Regions:
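Histidine-centered catalytic micro-motifs
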Residues: 7-15
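Conserved alpha/beta-hydrolase fold motif
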Residues: 8, 47-48
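C-terminal active-site subregion of NodB/CE4 polysaccharide deacetylases
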Residues: 3, 20-47, 53-148
């Protein structure tokens, strides 16, 4: 994939929520994953997608210290922000079952993109308010609906 021009990005070693673990563990999660990927593909991995979209200024500092140049977040946005000179790039979630027509709607509808940003902010607030319980509640709800 890499030879065909795909960007190989890191995501963390074990997909932990980076804001829920110690900064020492954050560094381990990121550097271990980065080193592992670089060994496999034989070139630098300079891009990361933050697991679960959860980060803080301290986490971002470690991301940069580990050597990442571009940082993808889960924040729905068309704007590129910067943190200590590095790009923070938001994105819109396109899942395996997202239809092409829905992608076109996201691209062409500012109203839909605004709604998606509001949804993101509401869920972000819920994650912050519920802490580690957010993911447990979310998993329980998803399991219930998947069974239906």
């Amino acid at each position: 994939m890499c030879k065909r021009g795909h960007i190989i990005a890191a995501h963390s070693h074990s997909h932990k929520v980076l804001t829920d673990i110690s900064l020492e563990d954050v560094k381990y999660e990121l550097s271990t994953n980065k080193d592992y990927l670089e060994t496999i593909i034989g070139r630098p991995v300079e891009t990361i997608s933050i697991p679960n979209g959860s980060y803080s200024a301290d986490v971002l500092k470690i991301v940069i210290d580990v050597g990442f140049q571009s940082i993808y977040t889960s924040k729905p946005s068309t704007k590129v922000e910067t943190f200590h000179g590095k790009d923070l790039i938001g994105r819109y979630a396109i899942m395996h079952n997202t239809k092409a027509d829905d992608v076109v709607k996201i691209i062409s509808s500012a109203t839909l993109r605004t709604w998606m940003r509001y949804r993101y902010e509401i869920l972000k607030f819920a994650r912050q308010a519920l802490g580690q319980y957010y993911y447990k509640i979310r998993t329980t709800i998803l399991r219930y609906f998947v069974k239906l």
